Every structure is written in structure tokens, then in C-alpha cells.
């Protein structure tokens, strides 16, 4: 155990240039490359980026602007979210704010129509 502690102390004392040289020497000695894991990790990310091309199933409804009928919008927000009066008022006055997350397309469109019928500007993402 003392040998490992001594090794850690010696490695900690290396300069950046010495550490880089050590890294190259170890790569040659062990036949590995420090760059390989980066390339491997990048491949799944590209696959994940292609996945959103499929049809979206969960949507987020965002109140962009309350509009002229703020009281009616607050009432609808309370009905949709189950928030209390103060919380719903804060949400409406703090627009743009998320009203509901993870809803299906039909529910998102229903919420959007309810709010827009009361003068609000709504985005579905």
C-alpha cells in the first residue's frame, strides 16, 4: 500500500508536459490510444440524434403570453394543472412558462385550444 501512495505522490509532482509524455509512453507500451474511447462514445450520440426523427409521442404545453383575458386564462390554468389561485396567477404572469409536460398529442391540442379560446398564446413542443 505504501508503494501505491508513493507512486501517487510522484505522479502528482509531474508537470503537465511530463504527464503528457508519460501518457504517450504508456500508450505505446500497452498498445492503446487515449483517443479511442472518445470515438466510441460519439457513435451512440449520433444514433440518439436520429431517434427524434420518429414521431413525437409526448408534448409540452407552454403558455407564451396570457393575452387580454388574464383572469379567464388563470381559471383555465387552475383547471388544467390543479394549481391554487396564487400559483396559477404566478404562472400566467410569469409567461412564458410550462403549463403541462409529457402529455399526448390530443391532450396537448385540447389544452392549447382551451387557452387560446381565452386569449392566450400557447406553444406545443
UniProtKB/Swiss-Prot annotation:
Cystine connections: none
What Gene Ontology molecular-function terms does this entry list?
mRNA binding; structural constituent of ribosome
One of its Pfam families is: Ribosomal_L12
For this protein, the parts annotated as crossing the membrane are none
One GO location term (cellular component): cytosolic large ribosomal subunit
Leader peptide range in chain numbering: none
Q: Report keywords, A-Z.
A: Ribonucleoprotein, Ribosomal protein
What's the domain of life for this entry? Bacteria
What biological-process terms (Gene Ontology) are attached? Answer: translation
Its job: Forms part of the ribosomal stalk which helps the ribosome interact with GTP-bound translation factors. Is thus essential for accurate translation.
Mind telling me which NCBIfam families this protein's record contains?
L12
Q: Which family does it belong to?
A: Belongs to the bacterial ribosomal protein bL12 family.
What subunit structure does UniProt give? Answer: Homodimer. Part of the ribosomal stalk of the 50S ribosomal subunit. Forms a multimeric L10(L12)X complex, where L10 forms an elongated spine to which 2 to 4 L12 dimers bind in a sequential fashion. Binds GTP-bound translation factors.
Q: What is this protein called?
A: Large ribosomal subunit protein bL12
The record lists the organism as: Gluconacetobacter diazotrophicus (strain ATCC 49037 / DSM 5601 / CCUG 37298 / CIP 103539 / LMG 7603 / PAl5)
Classification from the root reads: Bacteria, Pseudomonadati, Pseudomonadota, Alphaproteobacteria, Acetobacterales
Q: Name the gene for this chain.
A: rplL
